[in-house]
């Protein structure tokens, strides 16, 4: 899990992902990239459920889909039931850059109070892709990976990131069903 081979970011996967994220604008869109057969990747569009939580308990969940995302935990369970590995967790930043925000980091880590190592990735081995959507159109994307040595999320540099950026900006739009 977490390996981002260039061939796996197919034009079809990128087109479906970008269309879903653009359609979510001006809210944050989200989804999962899953490995389906040991080789191929597919995009699974997910509803951003943060507004439901905010409506029920605004004190505990003060943010809304305009500036935060929450994937229904059942999406992860469904992927596991289908025998799929979640390799990338995707979300967009409406009218903002493709950075991994403090809120993104907090949501991606599982605190372990009193443990020798106080943080652990919530989904070990999964990378995070943040896509900047400005005025409803995908502009750029950056991939982030948990570094075991630094115990922090680091931006993935190199060919994978370049392929993604080029793929996002050159993607032909297609229809996608939820």
Describe every region a protein language model picked out.
Residues 1-86, 94-178:
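Conserved beta-strand-loop surface patch within small alpha/beta domains used
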